[in-house]
Structures are given as structure tokens and as C-alpha cells.
From Swiss-Prot:
This is Uncharacterized protein R535. It comes from Acanthamoeba polyphaga mimivirus. It comes from the Viruses.
Length: 356
């Protein structure tokens, strides 16, 4: 009825009313309308509407109140509120499943929010903050304590972190970095358990090559570095250590860590070759390793302080072994000398390159 009264008030006539609308109107304002034709009804209605206050009729129908209620939702200020809520709801929806999260949609959504220009600066900042918190709350509640696929889980976290870095979403970044660090520790511990089962340098490097994350790789390398069993059981396997070091360099392991490992190995070699109980069984030129090392260190004292430390340590530990080393020293060749000091030469190369 509200629509009919509005049409009449706008036209000041019933000429544009449909037959159905005439029927509806007549049933309301005519006492006996059922037996009248449409034309008769129109004729009866015309004098009545001339005396009618259309605004009262419209108000009685509830139209005015309904219109006032609905119209506020179409005001620009309210539309902006709806836009803000829609963005936040959409973010929550996209992030509802962390392991199958739509990263592209999140990226595009934050890009869109970031470029909004129809909100005041304060409102825009609030939208960014609320959107960030909505995403953070969704993600944090889905952190997996012991994920079945740790590597995949970490890649997802890192991908989300890339997006949060792009849009400077610091609250999420802090949470993600903490979770990624926890996962790194899980990975390191997992790989460490595997490495604890072997001291074979070839197998160890195979494990390292299977890791595609630098943080995990470096943490694991530190574990290897601090494992005396690996070093002791490979103390005289220079060729394998050279292979191991070369592989680590290719894996972009921090050179300072590699240098530190080589220093540890050389210290252990010094202890090994100055231990009379061990060297009594040595029948080859390697018996004079400490003497060759002494010459090498003296020649390179100015290259790095590491060589000064090793020289001091060597002179502190070197003792006469009780064996006649004269014949070995007299017969040593340049090739023998070089072969005994492959690892030390590798240390020298790394130190010199680091200083350039």
C-alpha cells in the first residue's frame, strides 16, 4: 500500500496505477468494491483521494519509518563501515585453513587495502591494523605443534612472512618469526638425530645438501662442528675433509663457521700426532706432521691470527716422541709436505680470501 500511495502522491492521479493496484486500493478505501468493475472502482476512488492526506497514509503504512531505517545504510559513512567489515571478514575466510592458505588472494587483498584512497588517514590505518590482527588471530590459532610435513609447513609460514614484510605487518611478523624459529629447531633436532647415527663425512654432506634453508643448514653445521666423535673418527681422512669443506662452501655456509671447523680439526690433529701412545703405530711420513705444520705456521703467521694461535698451541703440545724422526725429516719431499698440509692450505685460502 505504501508504494501505491507514493505513486498517487507523486502523480496526483491514479492514471498510472495497474489494475492490480486499483483492486488493492479499492479493497482498502471502498466499502463495497467486489461487484464493481475496474472503471467503476476508478470512478469511486477519484473523489476519495482528492480528500486524502497522502503523507499520513504513507506514514500509516510504515513506509516512512522503514525508509528512514534503510536509507541510513546507503549513506557513504555507513557504506565505508561495511567495506571495512567486508575486508576483515574476507581475510578471516581466506586464512581459515593455514595448510591450504590462498597466499595470492591475501597478497592482493592487502595490496588493495593499502591503495584505498576514499578513507580518512585514521580510518585507513585502523583498517590496516584490524586486518592485520584478523589475519594474525587466524594464523596463530592454527600453528601446528608437531606438523606431519615440517618442511611444507615452514615454507607456508615463510611465504606468509614475505607478504607481511611487504606490507610492514609487524605484529604478524613477530609471531611468524618466532614460529619459524621453533620449526627451525624442530628441523635441526630431526636432522641431528639422523646425523648422530653416522660419522661418515659423505653421508653427512648428503644430509646437508638435502636442506634448502640457510638458517637450518647453519644451525646443523654448528652441531656437526661441536660433535667430537665426527672429528675424531675422521682425524686422518684429509681427502674427505677437503671434499666436505668444498661442498660446504658451495652450500654457502658461512666461511667463518668453516674456518672455525678447520681450526678445531687442526687442533685435534696436533693433539693426535703429539700423543706418543697413538703415534707409536704410525709407520709413514705423517709421523712428522707436527714438524711440517710448524714450518707452515711460521710461514703464514702474518696471514691471520688463527695461525698465531695454532702456532702457540703446537709449541705448547709438541714433545719429543721417543722415535727417531731424523730419517723421516731428511727424506721428506715437497709433495709429502704438501700432502700433509692440504687441510691447512685450505684454511689459509679461506683466511686470505676473507681478508680481501
Amino acid at each position: 500500500m505504501a508504494l501505491i500511495w507514493r505513486l498517487i502522491s507523486e502523480e496526483h492521479s491514479i492514471v498510472n496505477l495497474t489494475d492490480d493496484q486499483i483492486e488493492t486500493l479499492s479493497s482498502t478505501i471502498l466499502k463495497k468494491s467486489s461487484k464493481l468493475s475496474i472503471n467503476d472502482k476508478k470512478r469511486e476512488i477519484k473523489p476519495i483521494i482528492k480528500k486524502t492526506d497522502f503523507e499520513d497514509k504513507i506514514s500509516e503504512s510504515g513506509y516512512t519509518e522503514t525508509f528512514d531505517t534503510i536509507s541510513q545504510y546507503f549513506k557513504l559513512s555507513y557504506q565505508k563501515i561495511l567495506v571495512v567489515h567486508n575486508y576483515i571478514d574476507h581475510i578471516s575466510s581466506i586464512a581459515s585453513n593455514l595448510m591450504n592458505i590462498d597466499l595470492k588472494s591475501i597478497d592482493l587483498l592487502f595490496e588493495e587495502i593499502n591503495t584505498i584512497n576514499y578513507l580518512k588517514q585514521e580510518s585507513h590505518q585502523k583498517l590496516m591494523t584490524d586486518s592485520e590482527m584478523a589475519l594474525k588471530n587466524k594464523i596463530v590459532h592454527q600453528y601446528v605443534k608437531n606438523p606431519n610435513n615440517v618442511t611444507l609447513y615452514k615454507k607456508i609460514l615463510e611465504s606468509i612472512n614475505t607478504i607481511t614484510t611487504k606490507y610492514n605487518l609487524q605484529k604478524i611478523q613477530e609471531s611468524l618469526c618466532s614460529e619459524i624459529k621453533r620449526i627451525d629447531n624442530l628441523l635441526v633436532n630431526s636432522y641431528q638425530k639422523e646425523l648422530d647415527k653416522t660419522t661418515n663425512l659423505t653421508k653427512i654432506i648428503t644430509h646437508l645438501e638435502s636442506i634448502d634453508n640457510n638458517t637450518t643448514l647453519h644451525e646443523l653445521f654448528k652441531k656437526i662442528q661441536s660433535n667430537p666423535k665426527i672429528i675424531h673418527e675422521n682425524i686422518d681422512k684429509t681427502d674427505q675433509w677437503i671434499m666436505f669443506v668444498d661442498k660446504c662452501i658451495k652450500l654457502n655456509i658461512d666461511k667463518s663457521l668453516i674456518v672455525s671447523l678447520l681450526e678445531i680439526i687442526i687442533v685435534q690433529k696436533i693433539l693426535f700426532y703429539n700423543d706418543i701412545t697413538r703415534t707409536n703405530s704410525i709407520k709413514d711420513i705423517s709421523i712428522i706432521y707436527p714438524q711440517c705444520l710448524n714450518v707452515f705456521l711460521l710461514s703464514n703467521l702474518n696471514k691471520s691470527f688463527i695461525f698465531s694461535k695454532l702456532y702457540m698451541f703446537l709449541n705448547y703440545t709438541m714433545r719429543y716422541s721417543g722415535k727417531n724422526l731424523g730419517d723421516y725429516i731428511k727424506s721428506v719431499t715437497q709433495k709429502d709436505y704438501d700432502n700433509l698440509l692440504f687441510l691447512e692450505q685450505k684454511l689459509l685460502d679461506l683466511c686470505v680470501n676473507s681478508n680481501e
